[in-house]
């Protein structure tokens, strides 16, 4: 069941799946792309806008050690006929 426009949902993104498949020095950049792809798939959104705080959390321990999972709050809105997902850190 897709998220209705205007709703907020908390997701736990499993970044560990990506960490195993890429070299150590590519982990944080690949984790950022994975978060974007994962949210787009689960929120059924064409565009995903990630808050800078989420990016800072991914890069907090450097490029080789992103977190294993990340709790995020996703708000979906409808703009010009497209679904847009806004991603923030969950409290």
From Swiss-Prot:
TM segment ranges: none
A biological process from GO: cytoplasmic translation
GO cellular component, one term: cytosolic large ribosomal subunit
UniProt-recorded Gene Ontology molecular function terms: structural constituent of ribosome
HAMAP family assigned: Ribosomal_eL31
Family that this chain belongs to: Belongs to the eukaryotic ribosomal protein eL31 family.
Protein name: Large ribosomal subunit protein eL31
Taxonomic placement: Archaea, Methanobacteriati, Methanobacteriota, Thermococci, Thermococcales
